[in-house]
Structures are given as structure tokens and as C-alpha cells.
């Protein structure tokens, strides 16, 4: 095996791990929704969409056997993670500043009209308000955990893109 193949194999393992982490985070969100009765708000649902996109892109990239395809999908992962960072930061700012709203009246019908909300309503239907603060986990609010998750994913994928940028030339 040459260095090219070994590096691609390591990258594919990282992408599989990333995909499984997204599945675990989504499973945790469903646990909080159905066991702890913490209803998701529009921004929560948007964050779920970003985690789903990251997971799908990661699993597809893990199945690709050339660097160019992996690079394109990692770029899409980075874009989704950046969108997730922005959404989670907005959600966190709403929860830390009482009296602010996520615009439930305008956001809720848009989020609920997306096709996945019709196909999987238990996962993607809005049922709560963004300003509702649920008990923190280890002292961090739920949007804070999402922000940490998106930021770690973004840093890991951007570092990977930077580290392997020369492989695209070959």
C-alpha cells in the first residue's frame, strides 16, 4: 500500500466517525424530545437538518475512493457545519437574552412545510419555542452543546482539507 492509499483510508475512517457522531447527536436529540419531553423549536429543527446533512455527506465521502470526491464532500460538510454554527449561536443568544424570539410565527410554517417534516414528523416537526430554556447538561445549554459540536466538526474538516490540499493536485 502506498502513502496515497493509507492517507485516504485514514480520511475515510475519520469521515465514518463523523457520520456516527452525527447519528449519536440526533439520537440524543430524540431522547430529549421523547423521554425528557423537551419539544424542539424551529432553530432546533434547523440544527437537526444540518447534523443530518453532515452525517449524509460524511458517509457518502467515506465510500468514495478518490481525493477529489472526498474534497468536494468535505467542503459541503464544512459549509453545513458553518451554517450549524450560525444557527446554534443565534439560538444560544436567544436563550441567553430573555425577551428575544426566534420569530416562531414566521419560521415555524417554513420549517414544517419542508418535505422531511412531512416524511418524518417525529423528527422534524416544530413543537416548541426557541426561548424555552431546558435544564443544562453539565452546565451548558442545549444550543451550546450544538454549537460545540458544529465548531468541532468545522475545525476538524477544515484542518483535514488544509492538510490534504496537495493531494488534489495529483
From Swiss-Prot:
It is a multi-pass membrane protein. Disulfide bonds join 41-44, 102-130. The keyword 4Fe-4S does not apply. Belongs to the DsbB family. PANTHER family: DISULFIDE BOND FORMATION PROTEIN B. GO terms for cellular component: plasma membrane. One of its GO terms (molecular function) is electron transfer activity. Residues 1-14, 65-71, 164-170 are cytoplasmic. Residues 32-49, 90-144 are periplasmic. GO terms for biological process: protein folding. It comes from Burkholderia cepacia. It is found in: Cell inner membrane. Required for disulfide bond formation in some periplasmic proteins. Acts by oxidizing the DsbA protein. Required for the production of extracellular protease. The keyword Transmembrane applies. This is Disulfide bond formation protein B. It comes from the Bacteria. InterPro entries: DiS_bond_form_DsbB/BdbC (IPR003752), Disulphide_bond_form_DsbB (IPR022920), DsbB (IPR050183), DsbB-like_sf (IPR023380). Keywords: Cell inner membrane, Cell membrane, Chaperone, Disulfide bond, Electron transport, Membrane, Oxidoreductase, Redox-active center, Transmembrane, Transmembrane helix, Transport. The chain crosses the membrane at residues 15-31, 50-64, 72-89, 145-163.
Amino acid at each position: 500500500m502506498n502513502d496515497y492509499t493509507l492517507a485516504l483510508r485514514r480520511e475515510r475512517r475519520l469521515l465514518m466517525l463523523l457520520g456516527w457522531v452525527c447519528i449519536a447527536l440526533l439520537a440524543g436529540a430524540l431522547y430529549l424530545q421523547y423521554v425528557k419531553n423537551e419539544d424542539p423549536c424551529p432553530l432546533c429543527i434547523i440544527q437537526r437538518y444540518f447534523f443530518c446533512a453532515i452525517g449524509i455527506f460524511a458517509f457518502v465521502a467515506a465510500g468514495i475512493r478518490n481525493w477529489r470526491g472526498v474534497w468536494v464532500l468535505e467542503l459541503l460538510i464544512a459549509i453545513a457545519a458553518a451554517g450549524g454554527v450560525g444557527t446554534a449561536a443565534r439560538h444560544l443568544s436567544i436563550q441567553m437574552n430573555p425577551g428575544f424570539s426566534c420569530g416562531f410565527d414566521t419560521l415555524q410554517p417554513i420549517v414544517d412545510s419542508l418535505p422531511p417534516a412531512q416524511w418524518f414528523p417525529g423528527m422534524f416537526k416544530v413543537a416548541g419555542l426557541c426561548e424555552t430554556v431546558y435544564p443544562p447538561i453539565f452546565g451548558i445549554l442545549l444550543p451550546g452543546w450544538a454549537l460545540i459540536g458544529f465548531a468541532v466538526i468545522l475545525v476538524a474538516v477544515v484542518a483535514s482539507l488544509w492538510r490534504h490540499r496537495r493531494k488534489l493536485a495529483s
